[in-house]
């Protein structure tokens, strides 16, 4: 831009005829303009350098921010992985505990079956013992009763009773069946 102004001024000076003083004044003015332009360009360069530095600072800040953001993201990912591991461990621990509870229930169920079997066996044993005892006592009582009757009854009385029963059995079919059953007819 500065060159364009100089060329424009130079061309303008040829088209006009200037006196040597005017030419000197014009050259001074051009020199002042040139100096001013150089100062302006220097200031603009300094400002551009400052702007460049600011952009570099902003870029550095963005890079730092991005780095911190990446670090934060990596830290969050690590924490999420740790949380996932904890959940997996917790799930495995819960599964183990449920398996232990299931085993305990199975043991209790088996124990209840054993108790039921023992109770059933005891009940059956008591019933069988009561039945056996009753039969034994009844048989023994019958035998003792017959023996006592035989002792009380003399053989002669016993024969008379048996003869009376045999005669009654001729008319009573039920009594006849009973006597035959015991081999008394």
From Swiss-Prot:
The chain crosses the membrane at residues 1-21, 111-131. To A.aeolicus aq_1900. Keywords: Cell membrane, Membrane, Transmembrane, Transmembrane helix. The keyword rRNA processing does not apply. One of its GO terms (cellular component) is plasma membrane. This is Uncharacterized protein aq_1446. It is found in: Cell membrane. It is a multi-pass membrane protein. Its main location: membrane.
